[in-house]
Amino acid sequence: MKIMGIDASSTATGWSVFDGNNLIGYGIIKPDGSDWRDRLVHQGPYLAQVIQKYKPDKIYMEDVPLKKGNAKALVILGAVQGFIYGITASFEIPVEFLLPSEWRSPLGLYDGTREGTKRAELKHKSILKANEIFGLNLVWVSPSSKKNEDDISDAILIAYSQIKKKRFGRPKSQ
């Protein structure tokens, strides 16, 4: 069974594909444009190409976590999620949305400390974990660097967390 992991945003969407336990593809889509709506429209064809190439049976995508703060970011992430969901629906591929804690916790990315829950720390740990498990050389420069490859590592680990749980195909427990 082929499964795909997606870590979506309006600036960079990471993706990964596994065939069984084997990581067979991964990458990032970084669309051009200053407006998030334009970037979103430009992401679509690239994501469709990846789906057509790998033909995943199921997709796991990070859900938008509801938290206090930036309402605009929630609106944008919700739009990104809906847009990508529409693309996957056109291929009739089932999608399951996972909250960050649902895929990070089983992989040991939370260490129980307040420091360990900071975004930059979690992104850095994601890169280290993906590099360790899959023998990759994904890059982490600094918390604010645009050269960080955490979108790719997150997409890989989103899918991998479900392989580890052997959940693909089974309904999510409530």
Enumerate the language-model features and the residues they cover.
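Phosphate- and other anionic-substrate recognition elements at nucleic-acid/protein interfaces
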Residues: 1-174
